[in-house]
Amino acid sequence: METFCIETLASDTYGKALNVDLDRLSQAQIKYTLQELISYCSALTILHYDYSTLAARLSVYQLHQSTASSFSKAVRLQAAQSCSRLSPQFVDVVYKYKAIFDSYIDYNRDYKLSLLGIETMKNSYLLKNKDGVIMERPQDAYMRVAIMIYGMGKVVNIKMILLTYDLLSQHIITHASPTMFNAGTKKPQLSSCFLLNVNDNLENLYDMVKTAGIISGGGGGIGLCLSGIRAKNSFISGSGLRSNGIQNYIMLQNASQCYANQGGLRPGAYAVYLELWHQDIFTFLEMPRLKGQMAEQRLNAPNLKYGLWVPDLFMEILEDQIHNRGDGRWYLFSPDQAPNLHKVFDLERSQHENAHREFKKLYYQYVAEKRYTGVTTAKEIIKAWFKTVIQVGNPYIGFKDAINRKSNLSHVGTITNSNLCIEVTIPCWEGDKAEQGVCNLAAVNLAAFIRENGYDYRGLIEASGNVTENLDNIIDNGYYPTEATRRSNMRHRPIGIGVFGLADVFASLKIKFGSPEAIAMDEAIHAALYYGAMRRSIELAKEKGSHPSFPGSAASKGLLQPDLWVRCGDLIPSWEERVAQTTQGVLTRKSWRQLRLAAIQGVRNGYLTALMPTATSSNSTGKNECFEPFTSNLYTRRTLSGEFIVLNKYLIDDLKEINLWTEAIQLQLLNAGGSIQHILDIPAEIRDRYKTSREMNQKILTKHAAARNPFVSQSMSLNYYFYEPELSQVLTVLVLGWKKGLTTGSYYCHFSPGAGTQKKIIRNSEKACNADCEACLL
């Protein structure tokens, strides 16, 4: 008699084993019984994280009962469907090498997924038939992605297919969501991020609505620059009429986003960007709001994300106004009367009259010529921005000049906007030989390199190199929705390697966020990430050639990403010694010197690193998001897959070591909403290490960002967390970040309670109480 025993799936230290006689149940009853057990175990997660592990394994078991037992069979069943998404070429490769793939794939690795991970895979990544029935297992999806990367070209590279499968299935790396759910299909749009620049003519305005919709339908997130659109009531010489400005156009894109969801798997996602000198800036800042005059009149567009492209000049004027050194006067323009302000930037931040400050020069030239259409103050703009941030958490802030002056591709053109999450910064333009920016993303699991004797920087370097090669192949194998996206990606070959699990690293090694050791390690980890990517990109250039826009790039002159920071005065030259010390000699001055010399000969990719939010990737692997601290030690995570209790297992393990994980502590943790700061029975040293993102001084997040940013080719999705919506606190970190040379000022500003947060009741089946829940914003 077959008996299903929970004790064989996970240790149950708090309850007795539950045995179910499967022979006496129908398939429907088995499914129902398993689902009951999964829900029951999930509700008990507050007692111990092993219950969540148990629920995850039950969920995997349930999936395995309804899916094919071999990879080739899963592909065959999908290919036989009348509306199969799989490409014939992919199916042919699988059939040809099915003996290798079937024998290599390890379905037991599915049981390593967290509950949040397996449910995310089921709902977002695993291919389904037309009736919504899941047709593959997580391991099948990983193999599908690996074959897409290394099996769809002229040569089927079995060795790299199996290596990539191992890296994915062992959760050492993750690829972006579009890659996961489009790999191997007839229309494999594998890229995550697209950047569009909207021109000020009717044809292009509507072209960009169409282009954005097509991209969104394939799973891509979109960033649009609106700074070139003439302001409201501007004269249109061709028709003799007046312009509607950006408001109606934003509403049009808002409607398009709602319609063109990402392949039916998640809502469409657009971000619109505007520079602060634009006459319509106050309209722009009000459009995201859920309350206010525009919202009441339904003239808002709350489904979009918003971003500000902020020049140094504005920050200088704002700082002077804050400290009563100036009146804060800020001039507003319409781009038809004051052209090209969004196409120039300040190469230097110096106040010297001979400094290379093209934006400042042109701005004041237009002021002198009285081309401005309005006058306000820097404070008024910031107050309007903050009023919106309190409601919805954005607009984001990107520091325009820092982004451009520290770009390896600054010779290509001015970067006018970013993407959905403000970590991708690729030049884009419309018109003759238009280029629409594209970036392919992946992330490395930093926790995978924790060792008993410290941290494995060599392993991280190697993994970063492997991801670099993966992403470079994706550029060649992917589908492009427009010729302008293909042209841009082939010319610059940008990739964006991010990270997740930094908080897991610090917790495992008992290092406190904000400590000198943590900041040094943050710097060293991202130095290793960048080094590994650059080294492999140089090797690929020797084999396949450099990206076409390599001549004139910073790398072609022997300048690495941190060198651009040194040149700007935002990084001291002794950084190499510091990294050498932290990595214990893995990366030395000689390492970087050799890398510079090699880069001059050629680099395959124009960009290498970009630190994205990694919400879904982190969910699927059970690690903390990107480079962030823990948002709470106990909360409910709301995703497209449902709601899941998340318990900080590192805290539990530390408390168990000193016999403090008791029912009394559990209740206090619940009542405190996941905080341990006022649980005085817990030693101060542990309380200090497990401060959540809201509980630590936000300057700590800025200092960490400043440590890692010199090794980021593009930018980062930098969040801040505040208890109260106080403008002075937010301005403190924004100004500090700007002075430290950060490329991103802010992604989301979270307030408690505020945008993206809620109170959620969690407890076992008998009792419940409140705890904070950090909802996924992507």
UniProtKB/Swiss-Prot annotation:
Record-annotated active site: N419 (proton acceptor), C421 (cysteine radical intermediate), E423 (proton acceptor)
GO biological process terms, semicolon-separated: deoxyribonucleotide biosynthetic process
Example of a GO MF term: ribonucleoside-diphosphate reductase activity, thioredoxin disulfide as acceptor
A UniProt-annotated Pfam family: Ribonuc_red_lgN
Coiled-coil zones: none
Disulfide pairings: C193-C439
Site feature: Important for hydrogen atom transfer: C193, C439
Residues the record marks as site: Important for electron transfer: Y747, Y748
Gene3D superfamilies cross-referenced by the UniProt entry: 3.20.70.20
Stated induction or repression of this protein's expression: Expressed in the early phase of the viral replicative cycle.
Positions of substrate binding: S177, S192, C193, G221, N419, L420, C421, I422, E423, P613, T614, A615, T616, S617
Residues under site feature: Interacts with thioredoxin/glutaredoxin: C773, C776
Keywords: Allosteric enzyme, ATP-binding, Deoxyribonucleotide synthesis, Disulfide bond, Early protein, Nucleotide-binding, Oxidoreductase
Superkingdom of the source species: Viruses
Documented activity regulation: Under complex allosteric control mediated by deoxynucleoside triphosphates and ATP binding. The type of nucleotide bound at the specificity site determines substrate preference. It seems probable that ATP makes the enzyme reduce CDP and UDP, dGTP favors ADP reduction and dTTP favors GDP reduction.
UniProt subunit comment: Heterotetramer composed of a homodimer of the large subunit (R1) and a homodimer of the small subunit (R2). Larger multisubunit protein complex are also active, composed of (R1)n(R2)n.
Function: Ribonucleoside-diphosphate reductase holoenzyme provides the precursors necessary for viral DNA synthesis. Allows virus growth in non-dividing cells. Catalyzes the biosynthesis of deoxyribonucleotides from the corresponding ribonucleotides.
Family: Belongs to the ribonucleoside diphosphate reductase large chain family.
Name of the protein this chain belongs to: Ribonucleoside-diphosphate reductase large subunit
